[in-house]
């Protein structure tokens, strides 16, 4: 492998039922920064059938959009998407490939990396690049979250990383000079070992906590499911959303869809109220960029206090009723 032959930054533009996923636009924002630093082109890779969203990709930083349009790509399947992406990567030799750490990206990324005989750093929290050699420096928690590891893949290309939604910011550009190219798709029956027959959507009304402006989150220190209901009451008064740590999810106090942290979702609300959360690095990685962090904990030395803008030392079940009462009083007086 001649490393010098591999240039450019690619972003897999994930779409579901024709709708671009937010993480793809966020990755374009970070991809734009990396591409500018290296002085290379930023390419969005869009797969689907009668796909839309090209304009959005152009207006969020892409220099070029490669469109693989084929009826067999209408719905995501591992085999078909892997084949198309690997064929394009082998032909055009990108230096870096970013994929969103969604349920699709977590299935697709490792398969593509294995097929291309390269490495992949999963669930990155930050990304940088060495200009001299083009090496991608991907940082993520390691060893149970006890340290942050920066991982490089200097001997193989393309360098790959997955990033969860909410980690990076979108950028806006005019998109006037973005080039759109339709690429040939070569798929045979042997490449299509699975087929989507029907998509049945969940009837549950799940709130996307990554979009919430105010989050009241609870951890092990809340103590019980009954106490967890206090979080819901405070969130309702403030017009916010309830979330939880991994410990709260494992205890069955809140559903997995509302988990914040390295194994949950990354959030950036205006206000994040952490109730009974100790502040493990895995959790902090998912909420540390909140505009304001308020921590409620019996232990004034808990790690969460170090990242909080305001700390309240006390038992959640005693503090929350007071907060709820005062919030109601202030709101009713306005």
Swiss-Prot record:
This is Protein FixB. FixA and FixB form a heterodimer. One of its GO terms (molecular function) is flavin adenine dinucleotide binding. It comes from Clostridium saccharobutylicum. Belongs to the ETF alpha-subunit/FixB family. GO terms for biological process: fatty acid beta-oxidation using acyl-CoA dehydrogenase. May play a role in a redox process. It comes from the Bacteria. It holds the Pfam family ETF. The lineage of its organism: Bacteria, Bacillati, Bacillota, Clostridia, Eubacteriales. FAD binds at residues 271-299. Keywords: Electron transport, FAD, Flavoprotein, Transport. InterPro entries: DHS-like_NAD/FAD-binding_dom, ETF_a/b_N, ETF_a/FixB, ETF_alpha_N, ETF_asu_C, ETF_asu_C_CS, Rossmann-like_a/b/a_fold.
């Amino acid at each position: 492998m001649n490393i010098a032959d591999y240039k450019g930054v690619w972003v897999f533009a994930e779409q579901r039922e024709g709708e671009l996923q937010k993480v793809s636009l966020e990755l374009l924002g970070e991809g734009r920064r990396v591409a500018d630093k290296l002085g290379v082109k930023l390419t969005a890779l869009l797969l689907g059938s009668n796909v839309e969203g090209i304009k959005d990709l152009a207006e969020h930083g892409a220099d070029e959009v490669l469109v693989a349009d084929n009826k067999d790509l209408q719905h995501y399947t591992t085999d078909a998407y892997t084949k198309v992406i690997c064929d394009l990567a082998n032909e055009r030799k990108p230096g870096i490939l970013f994929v969103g750490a969604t349920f699709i990206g977590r299935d697709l990324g490792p398969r593509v990396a294995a097929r291309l005989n390269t490495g992949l750093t999963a669930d990155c929290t930050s990304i940088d690049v060495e200009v001299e050699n083009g090496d991608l420096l991907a940082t993520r928690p390691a060893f149970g979250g006890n340290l942050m590891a920066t991982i490089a893949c200097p001997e193989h290309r393309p360098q790959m990383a997955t990033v969860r939604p909410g980690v990076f910011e979108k950028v806006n550009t005019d998109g006037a000079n973005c080039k759109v190219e339709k690429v040939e798709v070569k798929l045979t029956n042997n490449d299509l070992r699975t087929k989507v027959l029907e998509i049945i959507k969940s009837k549950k009304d799940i709130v996307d906590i990554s979009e919430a402006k105010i989050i009241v989150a609870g951890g092990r220190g809340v103590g019980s499911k009954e106490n967890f209901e206090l979080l819901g009451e405070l969130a309702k008064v403030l017009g916010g959303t309830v979330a939880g740590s991994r410990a709260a999810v494992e205890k069955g106090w809140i559903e997995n869809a509302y988990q914040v942290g390295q194994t949950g979702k990354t959030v950036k609300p205006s206000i994040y109220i952490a109730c009974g959360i100790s502040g493990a690095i895995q959790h902090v990685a998912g909420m540390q960029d909140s505009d304001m962090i308020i921590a409620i904990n019996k232990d004034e030395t808990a790690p969460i206090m170090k990242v909080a803008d305001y700390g309240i030392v006390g038992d959640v079940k005693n503090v929350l009723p007071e907060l709820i009462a005062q919030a109601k009083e202030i709101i009713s007086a306005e």
